[in-house]
């Protein structure tokens, strides 16, 4: 019985780490521009990034203030330009992860979309990270075209 459970768990992990998810990527020029991290004085930028390979075959939709803005895959990120004020991000997988932040104009915010092993499919957690960590994560990822 234990061997059957172990085999099933191994298959689940393998399924979560491989697969064939695709999203529309931005071109190299847009990616390079986003990685300058320049923000206009009247807006804030929120970078939602997923820089790990875990769950590579799983798209994870992201919504900003109740509106879909895109879906991440492994080694990808979204750059969202928002007005100052309260912003709510929701990322969906086996679970929904919600993050509220108060954006200030002229600032960048970095949100790591951590992928975790779930019961049926991948789970996720949104976490605000410091600028150095966020820039490094974005720099090893590729820009997704926002919806």
Give the location of each predicted region:
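Sec-dependent bacterial lipoprotein signal peptides
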Residues: 1-21
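Short loop/turn and low-complexity linker motifs enriched in small/turn-promoting residues
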Residues: 20-147
């Amino acid at each position: 019985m234990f061997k059957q459970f172990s085999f099933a768990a191994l298959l689940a992990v393998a399924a979560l780490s491989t697969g064939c998810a695709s999203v529309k990527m931005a071109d190299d020029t847009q990616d390079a521009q986003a990685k300058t991290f320049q923000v206009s004085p009247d807006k804030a930028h929120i970078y939602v990034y997923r820089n790990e390979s875990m769950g590579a075959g799983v798209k994870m939709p992201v919504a900003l203030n109740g509106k879909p803005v895109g879906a991440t895959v492994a080694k990808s990120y979204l750059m969202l330009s928002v007005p100052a004020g309260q912003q709510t991000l929701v990322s969906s997988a086996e679970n929904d992860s919600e993050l509220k932040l108060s954006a200030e104009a002229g600032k960048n915010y970095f949100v790591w979309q951590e992928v975790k092993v779930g019961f049926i499919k991948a789970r996720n957690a949104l976490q605000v990270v410091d600028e150095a960590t966020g820039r490094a994560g974005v720099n090893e990822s590729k820009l997704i075209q926002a919806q």
